[in-house]
Amino acid sequence: MGTPCQSARGPRTTPLPHCPPPCLPGAPDQQTRRLPPGWGQRTAPTQVGLADAASPDELQDQASGARPGGGNRVGAGRGRPGTPAPSRQSRRTGPAEQADHAHSNPTGGCSDPQRSPRTRQAGYALGEGSAGLGSRGPRPHPAFQVQWSARNPGCPRTWRRRSGAQRGHPPPGAGQRPSGPTGGRPAAPGAPGTPAAPGPGGGAAVPSGATPHPERGSGPADPPAAARLPPERQEPRLPQDLAAAQRCPAGPPPTRSGAAAQRTHRRPPGCPRSARNPGCPRTWRRRSGAQRGHPPPGAGQRPSGPTGGRPAAPGAPGTPAAPGPGGGAAVPSGATPHPERGSGPADPPAAARLPPERQEPRLPQDLAAAQRCPAGPPPTRSGAAAQRTHRRPPGCPRSARNPGCPRTWRRRSGAQRGHPPPGAGQRPSGPTGGRPAAPGAPGTPAAPGPGGGAAVPSGATPHPERGSGPADPPAAARLPPERQEPRLPQDLAAAQRCPAGPPPTRSGAAAQRTHRRPPGCPRSARNPGCPRTWRRRSGAQRGHPPPGAGQRPSGPTGGRPAAPGAPGTPAAPGPGGGAAVPSGATPHPERGSGPADPPAAARLPPERQEPRLPQDLAAAQRCPAGPPPTRSGAAAQRTHRRPPGCPRSARNPGCPRTWR
């Protein structure tokens, strides 16, 4: 046998320094039991050099003494981490015999006398035997290490749900997302080990014809196979989104800090993502809105790329531009552009050629529709405003199909905001429990046709909200809302032309979403400024309750409704109303108590009153149900629905649509 220490049956002499622990004398099974945990179970058996022989037949060779010095280096490949490490033979034999193999083997446990266990462990770092103790699969080529991203780690809807739900906490591990050999920075296309240039002949070790890395792709390569499917057939997934962002002819969007980074420059009309403005509100809204307050993790870095987030000359080498077949600027005319990323002088993708009504509503098409707006992309604004920008012209699919008449979007995303809109459960309250009442039933704002509301002289159109006022709607308001040009100024104009007069002034965002106008009124009918606009405006300020929100519902009863007619209540403000109001006297409209007349200013019809905060409050108090309960924060404004009889109710301070 070799040196004295290597035979368990030989005389006990001093062990040599280079022998591994199992060589120490003792009962064979004890030796096996004393192995450090993990040695000999997961990876190649300890008795054989890790890099040298790990497969059953090699073990057998060595055990029979056939091959003294070192295992077969080619065979070492067969013992790669993926293979079941302990050989079948050693599993069949018990621990004692296993130990025996090591000792009947000519060089004992050290198949290479020059290497101590420590050196052998260092072999891991050199990538020799296994990728590490307990490693489960072959270590992939560095260029493919990030494939998880392409495998659609979840349709944006999912991600959004996942991260949005966690509001305030970035999705776990978010910061690390842009990883990979180059730490998330682009590398020179084709540099060894980069995920770059994944076309045939692309990244260093990608054999020509290999599938390029689907997400990081760059260089004059074809789009990845998955991307060649028309958008309908692709699963909508976040990475592809991101990819699309990069391949916009205008280059990636400029970097902004904070949440602004995501909703940045609208892409040029030719670009799908551009048009779909920078990512169909549905997605982006969901993505950014959900995490409101925390930019999506790593947002600042997202728009990177060879040109550092600035647009490059289309077709410049290494730009993410024009990814049609043959890459570079010139998409040969007639070539089908990449259906989602499409760019260059190409037609819109086939799916996009259908009129919006005939397309299935799906994220990509959303995007497409956005892009087909005759008015071109909306102007860029900074901050949250960027996403909810110019109204589309009446001809425009996105305006028409309203897939984001932000009324919808706002509602949709706002609703998913993680918290149900405050007070949601209570909202539909009132005498009829939120159900429509028989037209003309006493106390309802219903039946606003001739002969409708209680005391409206027959033939006069009642003011649907206040229930009085023989005024006709302004001429402009007689057009159906579709035929009116949607435009901000007219919005405002309409607000003034409401038979009910302008809305009371409030400070902060509240000022904009105020009382609903009667159906006759353009702004009313359009509900007070088709929430598309108003939503846009006020929604933007979301996050800070309009100043003073908490104090709003005050008054003698501290914001709680009081028994109608109780002394000092704001209740029953009709003739004969509050307790001490002499019958026939008009109660004080704001405090609703005492024999006082309303202040002179309050006697003017609303149109003639200057809009001012107190009157607002007054309106709140004059609700038969009393002022809304006080809530803190923004909740204060969108509170309980007033009963139909109440002016502020009717304009329901907050018809969720408005207030929301």
Swiss-Prot record:
It comes from the Viruses. Keywords: Early protein, Repeat. Disulfide bonds: none annotated. Residues 177-196, 302-321, 427-446, 552-571 have a biased composition (Low complexity). Residues 104-116 have a biased composition (Polar residues). Residues 67-80 have a biased composition (Gly residues). Residues 1-660 are annotated as: Disordered. Sequence repeats lie at residues 149-273, 274-398, 399-523, 524-648. Residues 149-648 are annotated as: 4 X 125 AA tandem repeats. The keyword Repeat applies. This is Uncharacterized protein BHLF1. It comes from Epstein-Barr virus (strain B95-8) (HHV-4).
